[in-house]
Structure formats: structure tokens, C-alpha cells
Curated annotation (Swiss-Prot):
It is an enzyme of class 2 (transferase). Gene3D superfamilies: 2.60.120.200, Phosphorylase Kinase, domain 1 (3.30.200.20), Transferase(Phosphotransferase) domain 1 (1.10.510.10). This is Lectin-domain containing receptor kinase VI.4. Its EC number is 2.7.11.1. Disruption phenotype: Slight enhancement in abscisic acid-inhibited germination. Redundant with LECRKA4.1 and LECRKA4.2. It comes from Arabidopsis thaliana (Mouse-ear cress). It catalyses: L-seryl-[protein] + ATP = O-phospho-L-seryl-[protein] + ADP + H(+); L-threonyl-[protein] + ATP = O-phospho-L-threonyl-[protein] + ADP + H(+).
Amino acid sequence: MGRAKSMVSLLLVLFLVRAHVATTETTTEFIFHGFKGNQSEIHMQGDSTITSNGLLRLTDRNSDVVGTAFYHKPVRLLDSNSTNTTVRSFSTSFIFIIPSSSTSNGGFGFTFTLSPTPNRTDADPEQYMGLLNERNDGNSSNHVFAVEFDTVQGFKDGTNRIGNHIGLNFNSLSSDVQEPVAYFNNNDSQKEEFQLVSGEPIQVFLDYHGPTKTLNLTVYPTRLGYKPRIPLISREVPKLSDIVVDEMFVGFTAATGRHGQSSAHYVMGWSFASGGEHPLAAMLDISQLPPPPPNKAKKRGYNGKVIALIVALSTVISIMLVLLFLFMMYKKRMQQEEILEDWEIDHPHRFRYRDLYKATEGFKENRVVGTGGFGIVYRGNIRSSSDQIAVKKITPNSMQGVREFVAEIESLGRLRHKNLVNLQGWCKHRNDLLLIYDYIPNGSLDSLLYSKPRRSGAVLSWNARFQIAKGIASGLLYLHEEWEQIVIHRDVKPSNVLIDSDMNPRLGDFGLARLYERGSQSCTTVVVGTIGYMAPELARNGNSSSASDVFAFGVLLLEIVSGRKPTDSGTFFIADWVMELQASGEILSAIDPRLGSGYDEGEARLALAVGLLCCHHKPESRPLMRMVLRYLNRDEDVPEIHDNWGYSDSSRTDLGSKLVGYISSDRASSSHSHTSSSLTRISSTSLISGR
């Protein structure tokens, strides 16, 4: 009797130990590259079977059949250490095929399922997909979660239309979340739709993160060659906590319908992982998967001669349509042939013309926010994101406009700085050339600097002017010294400075900009820019440099302080005027009188001194933008301005006449027109080299 009691006690201890081990098993991992030889690990019911080459076939094309297949062991998905009902993180990936058929539209679809039991013998076919039936659909006692891959639309409405969508279902086959079958392209984040019933392998990644209750689902054809970065569905699913019980079975269910709405459903490979904060299902090696099934239709009882006649007629008609299509495409290509340039390949962020057309309401006049020498700027609204953009439409048949178009893409397209306008992309449609920028709401600096009080209610404040000046200096420093190449802007002026909603300046319009490798010399031979902002050495050699940008900044700085344009009349030049006031001890007379006493005298004197220093007639005596910014930030003292800063009236007149003569000469005009005869053939090499 005592020995029997000991045996009972020992068995009880062993049972409790085993139960404890079972409750502490919290991770499950498996991977199947095909299912041949794994029959014992897959619990199958209904029409499901494993084919001779290792495919898991859930259903064939027979009408009104159901097939289910679950992993043979339950998976622990509730966190037993938590006081709350917390679903553990899990991850799964599988590759499936639904062969297409010439005699059927397919149906009804299949699901990936979490179920408290692998036995779904009471489930119905058609829209219930072998998971539920008409009596229990929607019951909270089901404790079923499913991702449905539906090829027939019209659940419970009796229409049974052709469908192609993915849904998230909780205790019901009526989806809480539903999306058309698609993936997001990694190149341009565009959504690309595709068909489930295609006969090609399709891969699914399903990841659930327990702490955040977030579910991500990605689906794409394996021919894509990569997993898209953006999931098709990314949602919080708090409902899952009410669905999942301690142990769940994971697997698949599928069903077909009547009246030709039937498909075969195959799973080629499957991996799963649960437990831990970020479990990750093992990657499936496509090379190890069994071959896909043949894409053939189920035989029907049609007369062979009738079928042969239909096939023959269809073939003839198809050939004629293909030939007609090829002829039309050839004719259209001959009319609108477009050859991709190097710069188009290197800078692929291309907008679709129809999107820009919609964004600007057909480029209406009431959308115009500005005009330039070579184009018109429109305000646009991207409907998909509610973002505002600025669209610059280059004047058609303008060769210099085409030069600016390509130059902006090759320079501004790669520059990123808080004080530069951000170029989002470009568009080339027939003879239309368009550049797309961030929309800057406050317009250009000149419109604020010279605005009438009735427009803005007040003149531009001194604090705003000084901060704008420092912001422009910061942007030029980035161009000259901080980017990978040296960028010479060549057209620094108020109309090319845009002011954002926080009154920060953004230097833009890089149509005349040139890029150089560090250590190389500028080799431009054409005088470009705006009268009043061009450095005097341009009249001698036409050679732009960072020093000529510094000169233009100096003029702009004096203009910001004085509120006066650099060349109000034929003999007036702002730097000469400020220098004369400096020499006579009346430098404060240069400050914009509209400011009254609302300015900082120390900052004003500093800005005027830096402006004069930048306007030195000798380029080698002008400071680098690094020093300009240090002066404005008062990190360095500004050198004293000497009497020999300027040049005599005779030398100034001589240089001015040379500059005007140079701009109007044959040399300048011929250099401007040195382009290809085609508007779409502009060499990027010549632009980068500075010609």
C-alpha cells in the first residue's frame, strides 16, 4: 500500500513538472520549404492534400469544396506573465499560388487563420472560405482571426462580383479592414496593384507587435525580387486581444464556389515565429521551393470542333489587334520620340504631368504666384497628401530656359539646407519643362522689402531683416564650402530669396548656378547675372567665382539695410553711396527711413560695414562667406574700411562701359546660344564643367 502511494506521488510530481514546462514554452518557430515528408506536422481536413512534388494544395478546382491545413501543435500567444490580456508578438511569411483559368474567374479565396481548434468541419464553402458558416459568422465565441485573400466580391449581398482584395477579419468573414491587392514600389512609393488569380508565386509577410498592438501586412509577387519597404496594411488591432485565447492553431483555410467560381489554392512554403518582443519568421529560399503547378484550365464538356473554331477565330482577331496596336504605338513613338538624357537617369524623381495638371487646376491664371525671365510659377495642391507645391513652367522654345531647367536639376536637386529652396522633382512632357519646389508662402524678399503698407500692414522689421541676412549668408556658406562640390550661384538678389512662414530665407533659382570640383578653377566665359549685383571683374574676364557671389551678397546686404535698390538711376550705385556716407560720418543716413527708430544701431552699423567689405572692387580683398557669417554673428571684428576700398569715377565708368558692351556683344550672345538644336538634348557634362 505504501509503495502504491509513492508511485502515485511520483507520477503527480512528474505531471506537475511537465505541466510547468509546457506553460513556460513561449516560443514557436518552424519553416517549410515545401511540405513533402512533413505530412505528420500538418493537420489537414477536407480537400487539402500534399502533392507528390511537395505543394500544399488547399483546394482543387472542384465546385463547393473546403480545405484546411494547420500546424499540428498549438502556439502560445497570450503573455502568461502579464496581468492584462496581452497578445504576444508573432511573425509569419508564406508563398502561395492561385493558378489562372481561361474558363473561370476564380473563387472564392483563402485565409491565413488563428483558430482555437484545427477542426473546421462545420465550416461552409464559398464566401465562408472553409472557416465559418452562416450560423456562427460574427459570434464572439468563435475566437477566430483571419487575413482573407478574396477573389470574389460581395459578401452576404448575393452579387458575387469579381474581387481582388485583402481583408482583416475578426470572428467574421466581413472585413474590418480591406485593401485592393497591391504593393508600394521602393523607387517612387507608388502603389502597384496586381491580381491574386495570376498563376505566379505571391509572397506575404505578416508581423504583429504585441506591445503596440500593431499589425503590418505586405504582399507582392516574388518576381519583384525584394520586399517593399512600405506595408500594404499597417494598423493597430486592439480587437486581437479579445480574440486570442491561451493557445491558438495557425494555418490556412480555403473554399471554392459554384457556377465556375472555383480556383485551386496552393501554398509553396511557410515560416512562422512567435515569442520575444520582435520575433522574425525565417526567410524563405525561393530556390528551395517545389515547382509551381501548371497554369491550365479545368476541362469542360465543350465540343472539340467548336472549341477549335473559337480558338482559331480568337487567334486571328488577336493577331490583327496586336498588329494594329504595334502600328499605332510605332506611329506615336515616331511623332513623340523622347530620348533619355544622362541627367534624367541620374535624377529620376520625375512627377507625372497629369498630377501637376490637376494640382494647378490646369495651370489656371489664378494659380500664378510669380513670373521669371524664363517661366511662370504656379501654386499647386497635391490631393493625395494635401501638400502645397510651387510649379515653375519653363517658357516653351526658350533655349536659355532649357539650360536653366537642366542646371536646376543637376545642382539644386542634390542640395539640402534649411536656407535653400528644396527642389522636389521635375517633369518633361512633350515641349513642357516643369520644376517642382516646396511652396514658400511669404513670397520673395523684394516683395516684402518694397511692399506698400497696405499689403502687409507694416514695413519689414529690422529684426527680420538682420535674421534674413544671416540666413542668406549661411546658405551661401553651404554652397561655397560645406557641400561636396563648390556651387557658384551667380544670381544672388532679393527676388531669388523666398521667405517661409517662420520668416526664414530660402535662396533659390539655381538656373545660372555652376558646380566645380574642389581645387579646380571656374572656366565660365559668359557674363550672367543681374545689373547692380555683378562684380566688376566680370567685365574683364567674365569669370564667375565665389568672390563674385560675395560681391552680390554685399550689395544685397546694403539693400536690406537701406531699403533702396542698387541702381535707382543711371549714375547711382548703392555701394558708392554708402561709402560716401561712411566717409562723411553720416553712415546712419543709409538706414531705411521707414524703420524710424525701430532698429538696433550696433547691428545696422555692423551690417553696413560687412556689406561694404563684401563690395570691395578687388575680389581677393573680399571676405569668404565663412568670415562674413562670423562678422554678422559678432564672432570676429570687422576690419576697418580704408579709403582705397573703391575705385575712381573714371575707372568705374570704364569698367561699367566694358560690362555693358560685353553683355551686348556677339561673344556673349553666341555663347548663350551654344546648345543643341533639340530642346530635349542638353548635355549634362557641359553644364557641370561650367560652359
